[in-house]
Amino acid sequence: MARYKNPKSPAKLKQQIVLPTCKLDSNLVLLPGIIYNVTFSRFKAAALLYRYKDLVSQVSIINNLLNEYEFNPSKDSDSVEEDDMVTSPITISKVAVEGIEQFFKYEAAFKNSQGLVSEKDIAEVAPSNEFDWLTLAIKPNLEKIKEPSNAQIDPTEHNSVVTIARIVGIVDDTTNIKLTLQAITRGLKIAPKKKTRPNEQLLEVDWSSDIPELRRHFKSLKDSSLDLFKVIDKFIVDYRQALSINSANGNKSNLQITKPGSRYKGANGSSQKPGDLLTLNPLANALYLQLAGSKDFSKAFLSLQKLYGQFASDENLKVDTKSYLRLLDLTCGILPFPNHEKLKLLHKISIDDRGNELINMINQLIKIFDTLDGNNSFVNHWFYNEATNIQKANVVANQLKSIRLLLEGMTNKTRPISNRGNIKSFNNSENGNNNKTNGSGITSRRPKSNEDGGEVYDEEDDDEEDDELRAITNFIKYKLPNITTLSPDSKRLIIKDFKRIRASSQSPGGGGNSDFHVIRNYLEIVMDIPWDKYVTKFKSNKDIDLNFAKKQLDDDHYGLEHVKKRLIQYLVVLKLLGINAEKQISDFRKENQVPSPSSSGSNLATQNSLVPASSIVIANNDETSFAHKQAQNKVKTSIKESNIENQTNQSIQVTKYNKSPIIMLAGPPGTGKTSLAKSIASSLGRNFQRISLGGVKDESEIRGHRRTYVGAMPGLIIQALRKSRSMNPVILLDEIDKVIGGSSGVNKFNGDPSAALLEVLDPEQNTSFIDHYLGFPVDLSQVIFICTANEPHNLTRPLLDRLEMIEVSAYDYNEKLIIGRKYLLPRQVKRNGFPASDRIEEFVNIDDASMKKIIVDYTREAGVRNLERKLGTICRFKAVEYCEGLSGKSFYNPNVEEADLPKYLGIPYSSGDFSSIETTISNNSRVGIVNGLSYNSDGSGSVLVFETIGFDKRVGNPNSSNTGCSLVMTGRLGEVLMESGKIGLTFIKSLIYKNLIQAKEQPDDKYLIEKFNNLELNLHVPMGSISKDGPSAGITMATSFLSVILDKPVPADVAMTGEITLRGLVLPIGGVKEKMMGAHLNGNIRRMIVPRENRKDLIEEFSRSVEEAGDVVDSNLMNELLKDNEEADFKMDKVEKFYLKRYGIQIFYAREFYDVMKILWGEDDLLTKPKSNRILEYHL
């Protein structure tokens, strides 16, 4: 809606648009080119922003503010008066939306030009930012702007121009709303041909700026402004000098009186000037406070001086019309001109008139400073040279008397009784009937009734209370009654504390007592908790996008399909509950004929006649009485509807019945547990908070301290809710196994924090979690708690029982290769300063051989933390080479080959792993040398060699008696591991004494018994500085003992793990996958012996590996594998072939120790007695 007024002249471009309007409550005059911070009441800011709600729906701070109020706009918007639009706002019209779009186009063209805009410069540009839509016309409040004679501004002369501004910032200080307004240009009101809404105005915007004799105009403005700057600088210097003189003289007395015309000597003998009365001049004080009393003004004034200084220092600097127009408004807006003068300049549409008016204002201000200087010189001369001491004393006394009267007038100033009565009665009509109202009858979400047993505080505001107390009052009056998650008893306790703080503030001494500050801090914290606020990416649960959530999880993490599957199941349940709840609400409304929320608002205005006149008694005029009746009518109607809504809310609460999962991610460090929790929050669109529990040893850190203690604060859970600003965040309880307490046996003087977590992490109890500081239950059922632990079995049994544990196992070589190439390397390339690009190979290219060597030789871990650290090191080296290539010193090669790794990463680490294949000087003997498998504390697996050497006591000592076999074990072995060795030796002894085995070429039955009784065994496990423990090396040590006794070597390519019993049974162990990866990385292991009962673990890991590879596992195949596994001799070997192909290791299973002997030495007839088919009486 734009047109040219003068199509013959391209520079004369004018635009006619319709824009929303807003009248300020203060006397502020907005001049174009300046950014203003304007404070609005929360209600008026909400009413203003409500008009744009369809255009700024994604701005969270606006949505949060609008959620505090429920506006009921009238359908017949054209018939509503403008004042009613403030209390019953409606969204802006389509014409106003088009006006904002057209204004944005012309504004963009004006910014890109040198001040001359033509039709060809107008491009099709749409607002890109949601704040671009917050464009409005600001109308000055003429009632608040006074002339020097204390008369109001004539509205007929100064009501035709508005300031077109844009809201560029919003700050919520819990009491008021501060809007940052960027004043853009002027708009001239014109009479519309078609009727517009009362809060919208047809405006004419003049974008033309053709100024004849621009340089002459600018020279006049520059000269006048520079003269004013000199006068201002001189005044500030004189005033500060007067302050310093009076301050120095004030060391002896309040006012130094010297003899006329004399100069006096100071204490140090220096000559000083007499005092200066400039600081006693009210005009001087007012000017100084405006010029130097504000940092914001000082900063703006210096910027204005710099702008003029640029043109003053360079006469040849080109002055364009845009700079000239900007200087006009900036000069008037920054300098201390009164508001009525600024209003006159705002209404100067003609640029020539605007320039002349500003120069006249500047010259008038210069005269004021000159007059002030002359008057001050006269007074100083008379006071210090001609006045007698009595006259001086009278002057000082009159000054003090005037100050005292002024202070008394300020402190005793009260509102007229008639006005106070009107306001009080109107507030009572809004708030005195158990209903939250704002403005003129704007009702809240539900009435403030006490039908639910709660107590409602309903006392009028006190204008003289501080802002913090006023914010608490607004919370108690307006928000607390509508909080659905608080019980009536909890609300009653909060209101009781609020009444105590109000009584303390009104008692003698004010808020000086300790209880006042303690309760106020408590109420501020209660107010800061985000009650009934739920943040999510989706508008409702039925709109949950499962594909998006799955894609988000896949993009952030590779594999971990079992974790992702559990989260997708949770989202599916939420989606179904949302669909069911909506259907239940719809059916309920049809059965009970409940009107929809959109139609209920129109019924309120038709029932005014139903309210009896005697129900409200007000001793005020008819207009206030009518408003009172209207509010009372809305109260009764809303109470009637609330009875029906209480039943519909039961259907709405169906969604909340689904308890959020409480998950524990257990696994070694560096496997992505913490980052997975962040990804979960991102996929759900919820806020994320991390609580580190490592080293927490006080129960009060979880539950909070009681208010009786000094410095008491809520616990970590409530603090996380406050930081997240929602009641349904994703809270990560990191390192929950590091909590000090539980089974650790520490002193329980400060309580057990792990016991405090029992209530938090129990879905059946956390709906009413009580923090000691708050003292009332808080609903945590919608919070998703995700715990992480490295050693989950360190947790107490009750706490572990409450958690849904999901194991995040160690990554194998193939997974690390994919993770490093797809996730870690691109992230390190970006973090180390390389240009953004989709092809990272152009900057750092690591081939598979080099990546494998980094994984195997430079990192030995279960996770990928050290792998990312090594990739970061390589990227930093390549960044140096890339910069040298940019400077032309050398050619940049992005490739990283295996031979380059020592240059970047140094010498590969010594793995410490070796196997029995290593040769020794003892004829390369492998007797007694057996490869075991260990699960390390960092979550990785490795090969652990067990060495046993036997000595016959009879050699060199023929008289040695059969004292029995002795055993010495070294290598920093733990108690459980040493017991396993003793059990293994006892089992071997039982085989020998029962004659179940025989030595090769020694048919004598007593040979092995005599050898065993005269044998001295020494078992050692290398890497003696590392502690080792656990029962899984039972069959390994037993095999080592038997190898020495039979003098039979053990194959070097075999590794084994399993717990042994005294009967020779092989029991299952843990960490099979990690041990298999350790054997694979060793490089020398080709066969692996595991307990037969661990095959089901390998089947589960097989299924998980197939899913993470992107393939679909056939459910029939899994059923067949599990059914086949129940047989003693399984027939399906698909699992074993999978691991053979993936790791190059053939898996064997052992139910009893005889299976181990058979795998190692085969069907050796000399090994067992011919008559004995099995070595045990007990068979599985």
Swiss-Prot record:
It is an enzyme of class 3 (hydrolase). GO terms for biological process: protein import into peroxisome matrix; protein processing; protein quality control for misfolded or incompletely synthesized proteins. SMART domains: AAA (SM00382). One of its GO terms (cellular component) is peroxisomal matrix. ATP binds at residues 667-674. GO terms for molecular function: ATP binding; ATP hydrolysis activity; ATP-dependent peptidase activity; serine-type endopeptidase activity. Residues 422-444 have a biased composition (Low complexity). It comes from the Eukaryota. Coiled coil: none annotated. The active site is at residues 1032, 1075. This is Lon protease homolog 2, peroxisomal.
